[in-house]
A protein has these predicted regions:
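Rossmann-fold dinucleotide-binding core
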Residues: 98-126
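Short, well-ordered alpha-helical microsegments
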Residues: 44, 78-79, 102-104
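Rossmann-like NAD(P)-binding element
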Residues: 59-86
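Proline-centered loop/turn at the N-terminus of a beta-strand
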Residues: 54, 92-93, 112
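Conserved acidic residues
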Residues: 34, 67, 92
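NAD(P)+-binding Rossmann beta1-loop-alpha1 motif at the extreme N-terminus of oxidoreductases
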Residues: 1-54
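Short, conserved loop/helix-junction motifs that constitute active-site signature segments
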Residues: 85-91, 107-110
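Conserved SAM/SAH-binding loop
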Residues: 57-60, 118-119
Length: 126
């Protein structure tokens, strides 16, 4: 059975420059962004409003039923929070955007994973 992009639910862990640009692009292309997590409410809420998603500042409240989780955090925060981020969501598809973190950071933590690292910088305004 072929799945349409509208059926793919995506959660963003992070709401910085890269997450903002990627979430907006995916949303405008028809993907369903279901939730945004950020440690700051303003960042989470601002991006969530644009992509018509729920938001949270509590990692334990991140949706557990999404098909794709895109982790776009600062590298050090990603490594520190990784066990908490993936708990209960090990069978989803996970990607991170951390340039200095290898893909094998996922090994033994989740079943499906990858790295999405654009070769350019982003700002929220562009």
């Amino acid at each position: 059975m072929k799945r349409s992009i509208e059926d793919t639910s995506i959660v963003f862990i992070g709401a910085g420059n890269l997450a903002t640009n990627l979430a907006k692009t995916l949303y405008y292309k028809g993907f369903r962004i279901v939730q945004i997590y950020s440690r700051t409410e303003e960042s989470a809420r601002t991006l969530a409003q644009v992509v018509e998603a729920a938001y949270t500042t509590d990692l334990s409240s991140v949706a557990t039923d999404a098909q794709l989780y895109i982790v776009s955090l600062k590298d050090a925060a990603f490594v520190q929070l990784l066990p908490e981020i993936v708990a209960g969501k090990e069978d989803a598809l996970w990607v991170h955007t951390a340039g200095s973190i290898p893909m094998d950071v996922w090994v033994g933590k989740v079943n499906r994973y990858g790295v999405f690292y654009p070769m350019q910088t982003f700002s929220k305004q562009r």
